[in-house]
Amino acid sequence: MAREDSVKCLRCLLYALNLLFWLMSISVLAVSAWMRDYLNNVLTLTAETRVEEAVILTYFPVVHPVMIAVCCFLIIVGMLGYCGTVKRNLLLLAWYFGSLLVIFCVELACGVWTYEQELMVPVQWSDMVTLKARMTNYGLPRYRWLTHAWNFFQREFKCCGVVYFTDWLEMTEMDWPPDSCCVREFPGCSKQAHQEDLSDLYQEGCGKKMYSFLRGTKQLQVLRFLGISIGVTQILAMILTITLLWALYYDRREPGTDQMMSLKNDNSQHLSCPSVELLKPSLSRIFEHTSMANSFNTHFEMEEL
């Protein structure tokens, strides 16, 4: 009974862990898909600069095809573990354990590789100034993708220019910054702000924002936390799976052992009952002789008196 309760507890824990696998894997895929589009605009601005290499080494492992494939495979493995737990199938649970072990090794290798790569390309503040070279083609029909990337970055990071908003006046033939530099954006807002109130423009340059971006965003921290959580959950799932495999295998062997023990007990009972019946006459004779001896001794003592 206690063993059966333990098996039920292990199965419930595996159900919960598989649910966590699904939720965390879907979360990683969703955030990675969002960051993939986000990074496309950042890489457009940093193309052919030292900053581009740093961005790739910092964020590429997050959206790496291997990482995406691991999360997709983990969802399938979670379904495999769920089916094996429901049906108490030793083969499915063994496949589940092996798959988790392989996925964990791949994730560990990716984590070590990412850590080593991040240490290889240090980025200095002076590297951010090189982004000014990407401003000269802003607004040209041939470089609409670059214009879109600059507008996207300035809106998202609430910045203007590289060092200051005057970079647009220095590096281009524009008389005022783009409208994406406005705190409250509307058509012609930058011209109005440049002529009336400069405080309506973002005062901080995008170089500092890019430098902070390379140090890690909240989304990157969330993904790293999810990656560590998935790894820890995998270790717990592997331990519980091994324990459940052992318990189910022991339960399948136990009924045969109990049957053999019951047969031995039945045989001993069958053997003991006839022997007791055979010993009953002998015991009765011994009891009669003992009673006669006691009565003779009592009679002899009475005659002496």
UniProtKB/Swiss-Prot annotation:
Positions on the Cytoplasmic side per record topology:
1-12, 81-89, 246-305
Keyword annotations from UniProtKB, A to Z = Angiogenesis, Cell membrane, Disease variant, Lipoprotein, Membrane, Palmitate, Transmembrane, Transmembrane helix
All ranges on the Extracellular side of the membrane = 34-59, 111-224
CDD domains from the UniProt entry? TM4SF12_like_LEL
Q: Where is the protein localized?
A: Cell membrane
The main location is membrane
Q: Please provide, in alphabetical order, the Gene Ontology terms of the cellular component aspect for this entry.
A: membrane; plasma membrane
Specify the domain of life of the species encoding this protein.
Answer: Eukaryota
What topology in the membrane does the UniProt record assign?
Multi-pass membrane protein
Where a lipid (S-palmitoyl cysteine) is covalently attached, the residues are: 9, 12, 83
Q: Which residues cross the membrane?
A: 13-33, 60-80, 90-110, 225-245
- Record PTM: Palmitoylated; required for interaction with ADAM10. The precise position of palmitoylated residues is unclear and occurs either on Cys-9, Cys-12 and/or Cys-83.
Q: Write down a Pfam family by its short name.
A: Tetraspanin
Q: Which GO terms describe its biological process?
A: angiogenesis; cell surface receptor signaling pathway; maintenance of blood-brain barrier; Norrin signaling pathway; regulation of angiogenesis; retina layer formation
The UniProt subunit note reads as follows: Component of a complex, at least composed of TSPAN12, FZD4 and norrin (NDP). Interacts (when palmitoylated) with ADAM10. Interacts with MMP14/MT1-MMP.
Family to which this protein belongs: Belongs to the tetraspanin (TM4SF) family.
Which disease does its entry mention? Vitreoretinopathy, exudative 5: A disorder of the retinal vasculature characterized by an abrupt cessation of growth of peripheral capillaries, leading to an avascular peripheral retina. This may lead to compensatory retinal neovascularization, which is thought to be induced by hypoxia from the initial avascular insult. New vessels are prone to leakage and rupture causing exudates and bleeding, followed by scarring, retinal detachment and blindness. Clinical features can be highly variable, even within the same family.
Per the entry, what this protein does is: Regulator of cell surface receptor signal transduction. Plays a central role in retinal vascularization by regulating norrin (NDP) signal transduction. Acts in concert with norrin (NDP) to promote FZD4 multimerization and subsequent activation of FZD4, leading to promote accumulation of beta-catenin (CTNNB1) and stimulate LEF/TCF-mediated transcriptional programs.
Q: What is this protein called?
A: Tetraspanin-12
Classification of source organism? Eukaryota, Metazoa, Chordata, Craniata, Vertebrata
**What is the name of the gene encoding this protein?**
TSPAN12
